[in-house]
Swiss-Prot record:
InterPro entries: NADH_UbQ_OxRdtase_chlpt_su5_C (IPR002128), NADHpl_OxRdtase_5_subgr (IPR018393), ND/Mrp_TM (IPR001750), NU5C-like (IPR003945), Proton_antipo_N (IPR001516). GO terms for biological process: ATP synthesis coupled electron transport; electron transport coupled proton transport. Belongs to the complex I subunit 5 family. This is NAD(P)H-quinone oxidoreductase subunit 5, chloroplastic.
Length: 747
């Protein structure tokens, strides 16, 4: 065991070899390297697999022995101060290492085919391997200084990967937005690190916890307000990195990068870094009740905000991004209420489910691009999808499993972890628990909305010219966006409404009917889009992805089905498969000290309510979006709403519009930041520029000009005649004497 731990330092550096070798080969022999570029996927996967096997061995030893191993070596700067570097192997490190490597391997295999035609293939794999190195270095860090170093490397890699297609202005702006937003959190993190060093005199976790808890808190040796401020600054770094309110605005824009990047960022790397940091520092935070309250409050706000912002999104990746934001809020809420085990459990289950969903969305986008075009506004638009079950059955099945898992449907992975958080939240605050339960229903609604719009009904790619640029309401805004498409004349009656040219949130439009050419059911023969080229008339339609893209989906689907088993707790008298509790053995177990059958009974009771809420959300999504273009019964359902009392109907429409506008416009938070912060900073910069140009430069330039004219004047006065000099001298002396005598006369 000791020998295994001694070689644990290689964990972060093994994937770095790929980045270094690719760079070296491109430098020495660029042409040959580019010609055989796809061969580099093999060493990238192989080296990360070695790290995965090594991490698994360490994890097994952690389960059996529950030991912590730390190795440090010092870099002395002065006799009074030295920096220590090394690695820390404990249950949290082993969990994160396995998570990063397993998801990373699946993403690398998937990317080989997904990025095969991209000119930046080699650059992509170099960035990805370096990203894995940075994240593995972060989770093995034994102190705050080393964490900060790798924390910044993670941020740099995310900047490079989000802006991978940097020639697209929208991608370039997105990576800058992510970078600047995270600067706010990183600045807070650095100040917090320095503040706690000032308090404790150490950067090491173990020393930090012991000194802070024993010597400082108990003896009141420092100002508690200062300690709270430093802890809040540390937490601010996690808020930015894990896209918590109010620093969440970068996350949906990060979808401008390639889809495999989105899967890695949202599942196991960047956004997980913030959760990891709070989990690592939880013994510190738990000694400051105010900080725990702030963490739980930020978490519950993010849970609800992320879910509401996902309701009306049309971009499939942005919908998943807001879903990630909401689920990260659940994890932060769990950490804030002290439920360490539940937070890490949900981090594990969510990582595999969300990686499955993102890679599934990449498969969908990959299939839609030849049909609707390569612009993300079309290929990622759920408006133009639908009916993909027929063409992509494997992708559909895996995506469906991921959707059910995220909805919290048993026995899939996220059910066990989410319900544990819901169960623990009741013990902390009933208000937080009610919000968390309500959000579980919203999660089921928007996830099934996404699934139904993508896979059910019929293919809608032929409506790509009606994607929301006109005023009338053909389809509901929940599908088409803020403005519907033009009504087309003829046979079919679809109900629409005219309310200042704004559409409703659901399929339930009420007044004014328009006839549309042909019943949509007759469009079955038009599933494909026809394109003309020089030689032939080619029929294009969606198709299933290649095996190298399907293989990771199937593996992640297996994880989604069974990874929840590691944390199921049945009680000792029934059955015990709770590997996670044996693995973690955390120092704080506020809710899992003595688990009994009564606890299991409470869990089942809460699970019944949460699953019922989830099924209600699924039912509501099915009513509003299920087979919307192929089932005639849906028309009767829509028209039945017209029988509602007019006042109630108007009130309902107003409520629906408010919800839609809030969701579609991202809660107006981006608009607020744009007007208050961005424009404010720009105006301040312009004011500073104007002051510098007119005042600072004016004074210096004025002195120079005055000196010039003074010199010119003196030059013309001096003509070389001694008599003129004597006259000037006597005149000056006379003036001085007159002033002197006049001053004495007055006194």
């Amino acid at each position: 065991m000791e020998r295994t731990y001694q070689y644990a330092w290689i964990i972060p550096f093994v994937p770095l070899l790929v980045t270094m070798l690719i760079g070296l080969e491109l430098l020495l022999n660029p042409t040959a390297t580019k010609n055989i570029r796809r061969i580099w996927a093999f060493p990238a996967v192989l080296l990360l697999s070695i790290v995965m096997v090594f991490s698994t061995k360490l994890a097994i030893q952690q389960i059996n022995g529950s030991s912590i191993y730390e190795y440090l070596w010092s870099w002395s700067i002065t006799s009074d101060f030295s920096l220590e570097f090394g690695y820390l192997i404990d249950p949290l490190t082993s969990i994160m290492s396995i998570l990063i490597t397993t998801v990373g391997i699946m993403v690398l295999i998937y990317s080989d085919n997904y990025m095969s035609h991209d000119r930046g293939y080699l650059r992509f794999f170099a960035y990805m391997s370096f990203f894995n190195t940075a994240m593995l270095g972060l989770v093995t860090s034994p102190n705050l200084i080393q964490i900060h170093i790798f924390w910044e490397l993670v941020g740099m890699c995310s900047y490079l990967l989000i802006g991978f297609w940097f020639t697209r202005p929208i991608a370039a702006n997105a990576c800058q937005k992510a970078f600047v937003t995270n600067r706010v959190g990183d600045f807070g993190l650095l100040l917090g690190i320095l503040g706690f060093y000032l308090i404790t005199g150490s950067f090491e976790f173990q020393d930090l916890f012991e000194i802070f808890n024993d010597s400082i808190i108990n003896n009141n040796e420092i100002n508690s307000s200062f300690a709270t401020l430093c802890a809040f600054l540390l937490f601010l770094g996690a808020v930015a990195k894990s896209a918590q309110f109010p620093l969440h605005v970068w996350l949906p824009d990060a979808m401008e990068g390639p889809t495999p990047i989105s899967a890695l960022i949202h599942a196991a790397t960047m956004v997980a870094a913030g959760i990891f940091l709070v989990a690592r520092l939880l013994p510190l935070f738990i000694a400051i009740p105010y900080i725990m309250n702030i963490i739980s409050l930020i978490g519950v706000i993010t849970v609800l905000l992320g879910a509401t912002l996902a309701l009306a999104q049309r971009d499939i990746k942005r919908s998943l991004a807001y879903s990630t934001m909401s689920q990260l809020g659940y994890m932060m809420l769990a950490l804030g209420i002290g439920s360490y085990r539940a937070a890490l459990f949900h981090l594990i289950t969510h990582a595999y489910s969300k990686a499955l969903l993102f890679l599934g969305s990449g498969s969908i986008i990959h299939s839609m691009e030849p049909i609707v075009g390569y612009s993300p506004a079309k290929s990622q638009n759920m408006v133009l999808m639908g009916g993909l079950t027929k063409y992509m059955p494997i992708t559909k099945t895996t995506f469906f499993l991921g959707t059910l898992s995220l909805c919290g449907i048993p026995p899939l992975a996220c059910f066990w972890s989410k319900d544990e958080i819901l169960n623990d939240s009741w013990l902390y605050s009933p208000i937080f628990a009610i919000i968390a339960f309500y959000t579980a229903g919203l999660t089921a609604f928007y996830m099934f909305r996404m699934y139904l719009l993508t896979f059910e009904g019929h293919l809608r790619s032929h409506f790509q010219n009606y994607s929301g640029h006109t005023n009338s309401s053909f389809y509901s805004i929940s599908i088409w966006g803020q403005e519907g498409s033009k009504p087309v004349s003829s046979n079919l009656l679809l109900t629409t409404r005219n309310n200042n040219d704004k559409s409703s949130f659901s399929n339930c439009s009420f007044s004014n009917t328009y006839k549309i050419a042909g019943y949509v059911r007759t469009m079955r023969s038009s599933f494909s889009t026809h394109f003309l080229n020089k030689d032939s008339h080619t029929l294009l339609y969606p198709h299933e992805s290649d095996n190298t893209m399907l293989f990771p989906l199937l593996i992640l689907a297996i994880f989604t089905l069974f990874v929840g088993c590691i944390g199921i707790h049945f009680g000792h008298e029934v059955m015990e498969v709770d590997i996670l509790s044996k693995w973690l053995t955390p120092s704080m177990k506020l809710f899992h000290q003595n688990s009994t059958d009564e606890d299991w009974y409470k869990f089942l009771t809460n699970a019944f309510y949460s699953v019922s809420i989830a099924y209600f959300g699924i039912f509501l999504a099915s009513v509003l979006y299920g087979s919307v273009y192929s089932d005639r019964q849906n028309l009767y359902l829509i028209n039945s709403f017209a029988k509602i009392d007019s006042k109630m109907r108007i009130r309902l429409e107003q409520i629906i519009n408010v919800i839609y506008n809030w969701s579609y416009n991202r809660g107006y938070i981006d608009v607020y930041y744009e007007k208050v912060f961005i424009k404010g900073v720009r105006e301040l910069a312009q004011l500073a520029h104007s002051f510098d140009r007119r005042v600072i430069d004016g004074v210096t330039n004025g002195i120079g000009v005055a000196s010039f004219f003074l010199g010119e004047g003196i030059k013309y006065i001096g003509g070389g005649r001694i008599s003129s000099y004597l006259f000037l001298y006597l005149a000056c002396v006379s003036i001085v004497l007159l002033i002197y005598y006049y001053y004495n006369f007055l006194n």
